[in-house]
Amino acid sequence: MIDRRHFIAGSLAASLPAGATRVLAQSAAASAEASEHRLASYADAMNFERLPPEVVTAVKRLVIDTLACAFGAVGAEPAKIADQTFRAAYAGPAVATVIGQKGLSSVEGATLVNGVLVRYLDLNDIYAGGDPAHPSECIPAAIACCEEAGRSGRDLITAIAIGYETQLALVDAVGFSSRGFHSVSCAGFVTPLIAGKLWGMTRAQMAYGMGISGPKQMTLLAINSGPISMVKALVYPQGAADGVFAARMARNGFTGAAGVLEWFVQRTKGRTSEFVLDLRPDRFRILNVGLKRFPLQFELQTIAEAGVELHHGLKGRLDGVKEILVETSARAKEATASPSRYEPKTKETADHSLPICLALALIEGDVTVEHFEHDRWKSPDVFALARKVRVEVAPSSVGVERGSVESFVKVTLASGESLEKRIALPDGDPRRPMSEAALTSKFMQFVEPVLGKSQAARLLDTCHRLETIRDVHELTLLLAPA
């Protein structure tokens, strides 16, 4: 039988001038080197034995932190809406665990709902690279796909490492925000690799999976403009669920586009017109990922910490505060101290508001999930103190590349006395890592109320020895209440 595509291609090549034939050949070669194929080759070649011990440890710490964030959001309205809507609209084999719930969902359903749980509190990890990113958003897809396939803890660690490294390489290479797009656009490229690796797909199938979901997942930065809504917690999980479905399509023979990211970089105006994807097998960006102490935007971590440090010196004297001066980076001022941030209307905007978060820290001596979930941020005393906050760009931050998060806070009283605090790096920054005790405390704080002390402790132990478990169900069975 004649291969129709080869017949047409051969006939066309024969009828074209020599120059045009060369162009066709070059185009085919370029397709083979397209980003989808390079990413798929990286994922296919990666295995547990190639991961250095410090990377394995980093993955386990990130799983612990991510599960803490997810359990902290169990019962939150956005997650309930997502779960109810998905179950009503889509059917699928019930094979994957929804965190904090009895009963199973489809892989895509668990990816979506668990993803919303992970992101909702704004407490999950942070990478301050070419664009800020929260790479732990890929972990729900990895757990769900691993659970469906019945793979091991080592397989899960490898898939998560692939998810992190490919996503962080993309945010460094593309510069999404400079083009008016959000870094969550990576979801459509990352999750087909995670699913493909766990499901034993070929490189070509993984590349097609990215070519199916990637072009649809370009997300406008408008989601972070003005008042922030629940959609902040949905965009990556939605893209991840679609990426998992795209991997299924590709595994069954559906083909996808190639060179999507190259086209995107060339056709949109951003910080670079070149697409240089650095995916060296010996470079692990996961080691540059930080954890969060406070449920706030990344740029607010040092500001909140400074406020907490100043709290004790202001006890009983807050009524006498005349002005609060904050010096921070230009990006932090633009993102967290615009006029709308002084009068937030939603929880999602409040935890991205410098004046509100600093006021909470100064008044309460901490900034917690409860302050947002129980509407403490809306209180008149918080708004009154927030109005006294003046934000300036720190001279030391001018020209400094992204990742500089130093903040200076000076509180001046009506008496003329002033108190000040400078924080160079936030607790949890890779250059100031969160301690094991602090990470354990964060985990137990959020997991114990859902699972109970005994099961929470067993889940934590399972995470610490993740590379030793033969079946990931040993982990996932502990994610739901007994």
Which residues make up each language-model segment?
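Terminal-appendage/accessory-domain detector
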Residues: I2-D131, N224, I228-A241, R248-A482
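Well-ordered alpha-helical scaffold segments within catalytic/enzyme domains
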Residues: A73, A142-A149, P192-W199, A246-A250, ...
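A short glycine/small-residue-enriched secondary-structure motif
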Residues: V107-D122, P135-P140, A161-L170
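Glycine-rich, mobile lid/loop segments that gate access to catalytic sites or pores
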Residues: R154-G239
